[in-house]
Amino acid sequence: MLLLPLLLLAGRFPGGDNEDALQGPTSYHVMQISSFTNSTWTENRGSGWLEDLQIHRWDSETGTAIFLKPWSKGNLSDEEITELVELFRVYFFGLVRELRDHVTEFQMK
């Protein structure tokens, strides 16, 4: 989702190291690890990777995204970033609720 704004940003400022930015496919990956320590405590960790460079991470304690590079927000406004962070919060909350509702089916205790 953030890949397109990053590529557009690179395209707007050609020259230097940015010349090759649009020449080949670029991958953006999101990794998530959820730890269910007991029936009441869950920790979610996440990271966003542009090729082999980590540009985001998820802070489970504060429930927000940490941007590791000054340019990693792309061309998104603060309002759009807030909406994306809220979307991830809802996702993590829903995932935890669904897994807890079906814990007996997964044979986890």
Curated annotation (Swiss-Prot):
Localization, per the record, is:
Cell membrane; Endosome membrane; Lysosome membrane
Q: Name one GO biological process term.
A: adaptive immune response
Assembly with partners or alone: Heterodimer with B2M (beta-2-microglobulin). Interacts with saposin C.
**Superkingdom of this protein's organism:** Eukaryota
What species is this protein from? Oryctolagus cuniculus (Rabbit)
The region annotated as signal peptide is: 1-18
Tissue expression, as annotated, is:
Expressed on cortical thymocytes, on certain T-cell leukemias, and in various other tissues.
Name this protein carries in UniProt: T-cell surface glycoprotein CD1b
Give any Gene Ontology cellular component: endosome membrane
Please explain the role this protein plays, according to its UniProt record.
Antigen-presenting protein that binds self and non-self lipid and glycolipid antigens and presents them to T-cell receptors on natural killer T-cells.
Q: How does it sit in the membrane?
A: Single-pass type I membrane protein
Gene3D superfamilies of this UniProt entry? MHC class I-like antigen recognition-like (3.30.500.10)
